[in-house]
Regions:
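Cytosolic, membrane-proximal regulatory domains of ion/volume homeostasis and mechanosensation machinery
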Residues: 12, 25, 40, 45-61
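Glycine-rich acetyl-CoA-binding "A-motif" of GNAT/NAT acetyltransferases
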Residues: 38-41, 100-103
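Short, functionally important structural connectors and interaction interfaces within domains
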Residues: 34, 55-56, 63, 96
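Well-ordered, non-transmembrane segments within structured domains
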Residues: 30-31, 36, 43
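Bateman (tandem CBS) regulatory domains
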Residues: 1-5, 15, 43, 56-68
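The conserved cystathionine-beta-synthase
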Residues: 7-26, 32-33, 51, 70-89, ...
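Low-complexity, flexible helical/coil segments
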Residues: 40, 46, 64-69, 79, ...
């Protein structure tokens, strides 16, 4: 789980997403509304498509996925992987006592599994 992650907002321009993608090394992002609630996500696939098609002039609100999933820090990794696959999400929020404590994304999980296999 990553406890340090970028919070993008509905009104952000997609160029902001691309900048964070390249500078921060994050691949998938959660999107928040003005009240701090999670509104959606932007998976790496969307970012790559936007770069390829040169459609960065849109807002995050126009380009995000509304598919969301939430897990607990106590959930088993295999359960999280199955949930992500079933729900079609690349990033999940991790909450404890109704508080967002981090995120897990496909890239984090794949890196962890590769390291564990070595």
């Amino acid at each position: 789980m990553r406890t340090s992650f970028t919070r993008l907002h509905l009104s952000d321009n997609y160029t902001t997403v691309i900048e964070k993608y390249y500078r921060k090394g994050e691949h998938n992002f959660l999107i928040f509304d003005s009240m701090g609630n999670i509104s959606g996500s932007i998976p790496e696939l969307f970012i790559k498509d936007t770069i390829k098609n040169n459609t960065q002039d849109k807002s995050v609100n126009q380009m995000m996925s509304q598919k969301l999933a939430n897990v607990s820090p106590d959930d088993l990794l295999m359960e999280v992987i199955e949930l992500m696959r079933n729900e079609g999400v690349a990033i999940v929020s991790v909450s404890e006592n109704d508080q967002l404590v981090g995120v897990l994304d496909r890239n984090n999980i794949e890196s962890y599994l590769r390291l564990k296999a070595e």
